[in-house]
Regions:
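N-terminal leader/targeting and assembly helices and adjacent pre-domain segments
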Residues: 1-181, 282-370
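Acidic, glycine-rich two-metal-ion catalytic cores of nucleic acid-processing enzymes
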Residues: 186-291
């Protein structure tokens, strides 16, 4: 029978997968907000350059002519920031409720009757996350930095284009990129990438803040926490070395000397790590014999869940959850075709299509009857 701590670990891993996917969708929406302004930004840039020729070109004159471009850039980044703030407010609502339901699911009812849980305010979670820096800056400061970075890339590209003798249209394409390349070869592409990283990191930052807020409110039933890293070929060295390491509630190492630093979800940009809290045993909670059932006492053993890798965790999940994570066909390939989750990636960590998988292992598809 799974103990309360086993349940916390399993559901924390499942939730980490959901958070990672959600952060990617948020990042894509934020990038789209910026992209929606690019056509108008390019048009304004062309108008500005029409008033400037190579003979009269100076940096100060360029900056003066880019006023309307700068205003549109500011408007685009502010729209992205407003959109991201709204996403985070909605996530705070979800995470506050999830943390409570997670512990209610893991802890037996008769234990909860003796040690009721304390809920947390979504508004407080959001306010705390917005007031705490991640990767050295507040979210509002990251937005300001993104605005300045985009504008600097535009100005530098225009200046370089004039020095090289490029036409205005060539300069505009260097700024935005080429349509037949998905606009990924322009000067603005790095800013898009940075915007996506900021969005993903902000989501992880808020989820981590919600976990900590709930733990702080219910620290009477907790005795520590364990770092859980997503182990694959994209895992950072900082997260890989901390996987499964235990810490006290105030971030002191237990049985090792690896520092906690900013913690999972915050230790670096786009961090996918989470942590699971370790419940005290019924004895440590001072619950006398007879106050709870024998099964509840066995569930509240206070032991740290045994080490598990992603494949071991995945195999324990229901087919429904497996299908939600990798899709029905891939879930069948794992259950009946002998594949593992690692088989879905190439050696560069890229997600393989079903056609690519079929070319690699046609027998697995036959065995799974897909």
């Amino acid at each position: 029978m799974a103990t309360a701590n086993d349940k916390l670990q399993d559901e924390s891993i499942a939730h980490a997968i959901w958070i990672a996917r959600y952060s990617t969708s948020v990042a894509n929406r934020m990038i789209k907000i910026l992209n929606d302004s690019d056509a108008e930004l390019t048009a304004r840039l062309l108008v500005a350059m029409d008033s400037l020729d190579a003979d009269s070109f100076t940096v100060s004159r360029l900056e003066a002519l880019l006023v309307s471009v700068r205003a549109l850039n500011r408007e685009a980044v502010q729209s992205m920031y407003a959109g991201l703030s709204d996403e985070l407010q909605q996530l705070a609502q979800h995470e506050a409720g999830f943390q409570l339901s997670l512990f209610q699911f893991a802890i037996p009812d008769d234990v909860l009757s003796l040690h009721p849980l304390v809920g947390i305010s979504p508004d407080a979670v959001y306010a705390t996350a917005m007031a705490q820096p991640f990767q050295g800056r507040l979210l509002s400061e990251w937005a300001d930095n993104l605005e300045a970075d985009r504008m600097a890339r535009i100005s530098n590209t225009v200046r370089q284009g004039f020095l090289l003798g490029d036409t205005h249209e060539q300069i505009a394409r260097k700024v935005r990129g080429h349509a037949n390349r998905g606009y990924q070869d322009g000067a603005l592409q790095m800013s898009r990438t940075n915007a996506g990283s900021i969005a993903k990191t902000a989501v992880g930052h808020l989820a981590s803040t919600a976990r900590k807020s709930f733990a702080d409110a219910n620290d009477d039933i907790l005795k520590g926490k364990q770092w859980l890293s997503t182990l694959d070929n994209r895992t950072s060295k900082d997260c890989r070395i901390r996987d499964r390491l235990k810490y006290t509630l105030d971030n002191k190492p237990i049985g090792h000397n690896v520092p906690y630093l900013q913690g999972p979800g915050k230790i670096h940009f786009c961090c996918r790590s989470v942590e699971t809290y370790i419940l005290k045993s019924s004895d440590e909670l001072g619950i006398a014999v007879g106050q709870i059932s024998d099964s509840s006492r066995a569930s509240m053993d206070g032991q740290v869940p045994s080490d598990t890798d992603y494949q071991g965790w995945f195999s324990r999940q229901s087919f429904t959850r497996q299908s939600q994570i990798v899709g029905v066909t891939r879930a069948r390939l794992i259950r009946d075709g002998g594949m593992s989750p690692d088989d879905f990636y190439n050696d560069k960590g890229e997600w393989l299509t079903l056609d690519q998988l079929r070319n690699r292992d046609a027998q697995a598809f036959k065995d799974a009857r897909v």
